Amino acid sequence: MKYWLMKCEPNAYSIDDLERDRSTSWEGVRNYQARNFMRDEMKKGDRVLFYASNADPSGVSGLAEISREAYADQFATKSGHKYHDPKATKEDPIWYMVDLGFIEKFPAVVSLETLKSAPGLEEMVVTRKGSRLSIQPVTRQEFEIVSRLGRAKPKR
């Protein structure tokens, strides 16, 4: 099993949306490295830290899992769609997506600030300056630490 961090802006799709829908397709990824992670490495059952970016605060808001392995992002071939890519064809889709299934919403967001200061997360990709990739690998230890932080009762 592998572990991932997947970023999404909450105004586009949030952990609340995933909790309501129970599953969703993760379409619209238009970065080759992120696409390669989805296409070549993500497997059904892999665990995901669901990260709310451009939020107040930005951070991990819950857990998900890969519920369907990579398949062609059909929106890439739909003319006029916001994710259309004129180079993509049904024979060579270029872009792929996976499906995510909901696991858990945390009582409070584990903020980026908390991630940066938590022991054991010093090497976590998301904490590095300039780390903008929307899909990032995380280690099992990082996943477990963030999950523990997320399940902790919020301090008042």
Locate the predicted segments by residue.
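Hydrophobic beta-strand signal
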Residues: L49-F50, E65
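Mixed-charge, low-complexity intrinsically disordered regions
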Residues: M1-E9, E69-Y71, K116-S117, L121-R156
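A short secondary-structure junction signal
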Residues: D17-L18, A76, S111-E113, V146-L149
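Aromatic- and Lys/Arg-enriched surface recognition patch
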Residues: G62-L133
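A generic structural signal for short beta-strands and their flanking turns/coil linkers
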Residues: K2, R22, K44-D46, V60-G62, ...
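Short acidic/glycine-rich loop or secondary-structure boundary segments that cap or lie
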Residues: S14-D16, P57-V60, A72-F75
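Compositionally biased, charged N-terminal/linker segments
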Residues: M1-K44, E142-F143, A152-R156
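Short, charged beta-turn/beta-strand-edge "cap" motif at the junction between a beta-strand
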Residues: Y51-P57
